[in-house]
């Protein structure tokens, strides 16, 4: 198999240096403008694909050229925008057109979980036997030298209080408002740590959060790794997830997990989490309080989480992806 990777201006230098055995082709477009990226996907990408004489085009982020001139596979990670239109904001109109179009134009659709497959079939009308599931592998890399916890706490001014960590975009379907309210019911020495980029929804979250909630903004991978390790537990209260990669990241580091009993999260966490109803603030608080107060439960979940995390690897993702390629090229559907 010959692999050709099409990369924009920002990604090209690192991909060209790192991807041995693959041809990396630079496409003159910036990833900083979503509108320009979509326009390039519809115009520059098909032309580059034809020049490269490839047999199959894999689009990895939900959308695809309307006219590619060759077979396509498209990864649609989720269709959460269908359940929560406010998540996509002003871009929702474009998303509502481009994602279903990509599904129709592709011989195969790849997605991250059985739950996302069900949503793609339901909301986009794609035939179930045309959708392949390729669960993701580990997220951020484990550093060779993790940041010492004392150093991390001092740098981020976290003191010595027990930490409850969540890693989620500040958008409505991530349900952070209920988590903040739930933490307000916990013992006073607990701190909820919320890393991640600011969004238009952050002001509302800050208004309901007290001093026990720390919004850190963007953090690098080494810092995020340190937060997972320093946390007494990790909580993901989402109302919808296409996969739930932070759950896997937490389990890989031996951090006990509490998460919503919805969509893809049980596929990822298996029996290695405390589950709750994400619409019930009291149930969220009870789940977190159980983890904070029960050392034996944390030990069991730590062991179960490490074992559960072993089920996921990028090698498995690659095998499922290649099988989808074969199906597309043989025109099986």
Regions found by a protein language model. Name each.
Residues 1-333:
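Carbohydrate transferase catalytic cores enriched for Leloir-type hexosyltransferases
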């Amino acid at each position: 198999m010959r692999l050709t990777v099409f990369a924009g201006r920002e990604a090209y230098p690192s991909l060209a240096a790192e991807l041995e055995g693959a041809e990396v082709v630079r496409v003159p477009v910036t990833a900083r403008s979503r509108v320009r990226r979509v326009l390039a996907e519809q115009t520059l990408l098909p032309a580059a694909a034809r020049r490269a004489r490839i047999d199959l085009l894999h689009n990895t982020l939900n959308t695809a050229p309307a006219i590619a001139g060759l077979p396509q596979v498209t990864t649609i990670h989720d269709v959460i925008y269908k359940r929560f239109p406010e998540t996509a904001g002003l871009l929702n109109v474009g998303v509502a057109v481009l994602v279903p179009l990509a599904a129709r134009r592709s011989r195969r659709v790849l997605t991250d979980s059985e739950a996302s497959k069900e949503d793609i079939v339901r909301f986009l009308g794609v035939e179930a036997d045309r959708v392949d599931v390729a669960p993701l592998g580990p997220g951020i890399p484990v550093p060779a030298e993790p940041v010492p916890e004392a150093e991390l706490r001092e740098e981020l001014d976290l003191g010595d209080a027990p930490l409850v960590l969540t890693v989620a975009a500040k958008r409505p379907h991530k349900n952070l408002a209920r988590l903040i309210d739930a933490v307000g019911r916990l013992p006073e020495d607990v701190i909820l740590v919320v890393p991640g980029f600011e969004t238009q929804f952050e002001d509302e979250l800050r208004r309901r959060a007290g001093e026990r909630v720390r919004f850190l903004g963007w953090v690098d991978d080494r810092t995020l790794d340190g937060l997972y390790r320093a946390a007494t537990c990790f909580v993901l209260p989402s109302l919808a997830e296409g996969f739930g990669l932070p759950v896997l990241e937490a389990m890989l580091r031996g951090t006990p997990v509490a998460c919503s009993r919805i969509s893809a999260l049980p596929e990822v966490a298996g029996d290695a989490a405390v589950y709750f109803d994400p619409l019930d603030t009291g149930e969220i608080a009870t789940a977190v309080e159980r983890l904070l107060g029960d050392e034996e439960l944390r030990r069991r979940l730590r062991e179960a989480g490490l074992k559960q995390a072993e089920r996921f690897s990028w090698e498995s993702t690659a095998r499922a992806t290649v099988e989808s390629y074969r199906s597309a090229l043989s025109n099986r559907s």
